[in-house]
Amino acid sequence: MSYLSPFMTLLINAVKKAASPLNRDFSEIERLQSSVKSYKDFVVSAYGKVDRALRTELGRIKPDFPIAVDGQPKPKGSCFVVAPIDGLNNFAHGIPQFAISVAVFENGAVTAAIVYNPASDELFFAEKGKGAYKEG
């Protein structure tokens, strides 16, 4: 893929690495739905694992960038905005339409974004001035 910048390559690798445990977790959801407490705890745990992994991986790329979770106020200046499991309700009910989403904000504008659905292995990404693409 010649259209990938080195920065986008790092972001894609970080998101895919953070997503790696989600396929196993997703396959367990249906089995756990009969036990409401353990099921809810499991979903919260899966979300937390992805959140921590994203913070670790994105911190390696740009250690000076704060990380905001989608729906919370963004810090001033440049930052990553993440949705560790976008479509959490779908994930929680065993519906494979969920994703990990990451946006890069610089100078008040989105300069790069990734949406990755680990259940279908579909990845969409965009970078300012370079276009938007679907991997594969």
Question: How should these model regions be labeled?
Answer:
Residues M1-I85:
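N-terminal subdomain of lithium-sensitive/metallo-dependent phosphomonoesterases centered on the IMPase/IPPase/PAP
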Residues K74-Y133:
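DPxDG-like acidic metal-binding loop motif
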Residues G136:
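Anionic-ligand binding region
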